[in-house]
């Protein structure tokens, strides 16, 4: 009979160890178990490629997404002419007339209601998404999960189809003392000799069919994390590495701090620093030059650090 309490304790311990990691819905914005996100900028994509905004950025106002018109028009092949408050856009067989401050526009003589007035901010004209869809005749979709405005095709390209491989030698010094991190298992496991050098503006892209949409900073109880928005449904998630010229490369497996899903999206968290961890507590994300994806791919994927 004396052995029974010990047996029960062992069975309880085994049961706890076998419990699955909790999976949370990304819709639970106030759930304290989910790391808190820092501000996520809105991105606009035309045919799954980002539109670059050099000064004024897209914004959310009164539950409507507003975008700077000229850069979107240019990306769509439109010719924009501004005279005072009057804007004319010629795109293919479509001529659009818009007056700053008005809630309507004209497309080939047809009146279109915009829902929100066009506005001028620091020399840029902002329009609601309805203008892009109805006045310019484009398919437009707002994705509140990724904070992406999709215009046109949503077909995300494979990374190897948009970037060329480069020699990895100029980047080998980042792995000094951690050479094992250079190993990739693509057509056999061996040190990488090539690399894809990626700008953050190259996202989204696919790696072996899995999409990477964006990287963002998050925190939970003093822990600093990177959140990757992907379709990577692997239980462990693909590992990352932080490459810093002044310290050893740091491998970051996907953390079990939370498993967060929203439809086809998977959110993987990577621990940058922890206040109780001697090795990482003083590490700041801006120290890294690159965030490296350790995927089994023709070359190492080196993303220029978007956080420094």
Task: Annotate each language-model stretch with its function.
Residues 4-7, 22-223, 266-308:
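Primary recognition of N-terminal secretory signal peptides and signal-anchoring hydrophobic helices
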Residues 9-22:
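Bacterial N-terminal signal peptides
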Residues 209, 222-237:
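Aromatic/hydrophobic beta-strand junction motif of beta-rich domains
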Residues 240-244:
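Conserved aromatic beta-strand anchor motif in extracellular beta-sandwich/beta-rich domains
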Residues 245-272:
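Solvent-exposed serine/threonine-rich low-complexity stretches and specific carbohydrate-binding patches
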């Amino acid at each position: 009979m004396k052995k029974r309490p010990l047996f029960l304790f062992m069975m309880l311990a085994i049961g706890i160890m076998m419990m699955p990691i909790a999976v949370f819905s990304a819709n639970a914005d106030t759930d304290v178990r989910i790391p808190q996100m820092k501000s996520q900028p809105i991105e606009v994509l035309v045919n799954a490629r980002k539109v670059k905004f050099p000064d004024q950025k897209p914004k959310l106002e009164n539950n409507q997404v507003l975008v700077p018109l000229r850069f979107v028009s240019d990306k769509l092949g439109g010719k924009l002419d501004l005279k005072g408050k009057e804007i004319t856009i010629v795109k293919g067989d479509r001529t659009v007339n818009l007056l700053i401050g008005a809630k309507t526009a004209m497309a080939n003589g047809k009146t279109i209601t915009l829902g929100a007035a066009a506005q001028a901010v620091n020399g840029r004209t902002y329009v609601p998404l309805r203008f892009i869809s109805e006045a310019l005749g484009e398919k437009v979709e707002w994705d509140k999960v990724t904070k992406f405005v999709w215009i046109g095709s949503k077909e995300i390209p494979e990374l190897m189809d948009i970037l060329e491989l480069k020699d990895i030698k100029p980047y080998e010094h980042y792995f000094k003392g951690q050479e094992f991190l250079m190993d990739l298992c693509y057509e056999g496991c061996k040190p990488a000799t090539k690399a894809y050098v990626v700008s953050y503006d190259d996202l989204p892209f696919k790696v072996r069919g899995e999409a990477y949409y964006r990287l963002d900073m998050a925190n939970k109880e003093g822990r600093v994390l990177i959140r990757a928005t992907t379709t990577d449904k692997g239980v462990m998630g693909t590992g990352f590495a932080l490459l810093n010229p002044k310290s050893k490369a740091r491998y970051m497996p996907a953390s079990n701090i939370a498993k967060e899903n929203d439809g086809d999206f998977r959110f993987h968290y990577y621990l940058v620093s922890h206040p109780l961890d001697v090795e990482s507590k003083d590490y700041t994300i801006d120290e890294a030059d690159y965030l490296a994806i350790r995927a089994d791919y023709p070359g190492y994927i080196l993303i220029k650090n978007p956080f420094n």
